[in-house]
Amino acid sequence: MGERTWPQLLAALLRGDELSTADTAWAMGEIMSGSAGSAQIAGFAIALRAKGETPAEVSGLVEAMLQHAVRVELPEDLRATAVDVVGTGGDLAHTVNISTMASLVVAGAGVRVVKHGNRAASSSCGTADVLEFLGLPLDLGPEGVAACVAEAGIGFCFAARFHPGMRHAGPVRRELGVPTAFNFLGPLTNPARPRAGAVGCFDARMAPVMAAVFAARGDSTLVLRGEDGLDEFTTAAPTRVWAAQNGTVREALLDAADLGVPRATLADLRGGDVACNADAVRRLLAGETGPIRDAVLVNAAAALATQAPLDGDLTEALRTGLSRAAESIDSGAAARTLNRWIEVAHAVRPVLG
């Protein structure tokens, strides 16, 4: 395709043609820069969704989004070993903040975490909401986040702060009211670019697409989708896992019950408003046992497993991760991580922003 125009791209999508990575990168660049009109954004998002996004198309969206992001610069050795524990959201299950709690557990186990998230969209309480309620400032800039990762072992990139260009798509997304490619970009566009992670996806078709994008850029990532629709490693049903590592993707169906984790129900994992979900975080870190702890442990185990080769027995890798995750909570390390994180964040905020 020569000089790109919206009519050309939209006509191609309506014919069912696949776009190139360069095509979708151009479109996303137009959106992020504020050059695209609302009709163009809506038409593009819906036409791409109706055709079905390919890994190459999603890669273009991700590439442009990261180019427009406020980047968090981490030392390469730290970035190479850091993880993200994150989900797409959108499963409409209204659970507690499992990935947020798992992030604290992973950091308590000694693995650096750079979490990327936002306020609630389809749920009652998003990552940003619960972290803010617990006392973490959300407005830290890239230097502040990097300092938290270095000194506390965990940092948080508030999506609204680090992807300002996405504000141009926000009104259209809200008016459309249906999932589009935009709903799956968050876990793929962490501005610190950690090389590993456990990523939940509620959409069965998009989960392998996301895994292919992670694989293509050389990341070590487990993409997770519960057979009950959760964008987590669920304890209420088996979980389909796409293991992306060394440029390849391997799919498996795993069950937390095979790890000795008791079967839960979705009701066991349900949260509420921000005060309710923050209380669940505190109770977990204080050592409370039960279905919420079980779900957090298995998701933390998934993130910890990405630090090792994923071409072997995934169940055994998760079993090892479970033990490390439990020790993180039971030793008090996860609780100390949260306290230290809040302390560092408030200390660096006036200096680094």
Swiss-Prot record:
Keyword Glycosyltransferase part of the UniProt annotation: yes
Positions with a binding annotation for anthranilate 2: 173
GO BP term (any one): L-tryptophan biosynthetic process
Pathway(s) annotated for this protein in UniProt: Amino-acid biosynthesis; L-tryptophan biosynthesis; L-tryptophan from chorismate: step 2/5
Sequence positions that bind Mg(2+) 2: 231-232
Top-level taxon of the source organism: Bacteria
Keyword Cell inner membrane set for record: no
EC id: 2.4.2.18
Positions that bind 5-phospho-alpha-D-ribose 1-diphosphate: 87, 90-91, 95, 97-100, 115-123, 127
SUPFAM superfamilies listed in its UniProt record: Nucleoside phosphorylase/phosphoribosyltransferase catalytic domain, Nucleoside phosphorylase/phosphoribosyltransferase N-terminal domain
Annotated binding of Mg(2+) 1, by residue: 99, 232
Gene3D superfamilies: Nucleoside phosphorylase/phosphoribosyltransferase catalytic domain (3.40.1030.10), Transferase, Pyrimidine Nucleoside Phosphorylase, Chain C (1.20.970.10)
Keyword tags: Amino-acid biosynthesis, Aromatic amino acid biosynthesis, Glycosyltransferase, Magnesium, Metal-binding, Transferase, Tryptophan biosynthesis
Cofactor binding, note field: Binds 2 magnesium ions per monomer.
Catalytic activity: N-(5-phospho-beta-D-ribosyl)anthranilate + diphosphate = 5-phospho-alpha-D-ribose 1-diphosphate + anthranilate
Top EC class for this record: transferase
Family classification: Belongs to the anthranilate phosphoribosyltransferase family.
NCBIfam families: trpD
Annotated protein name in UniProt: Anthranilate phosphoribosyltransferase
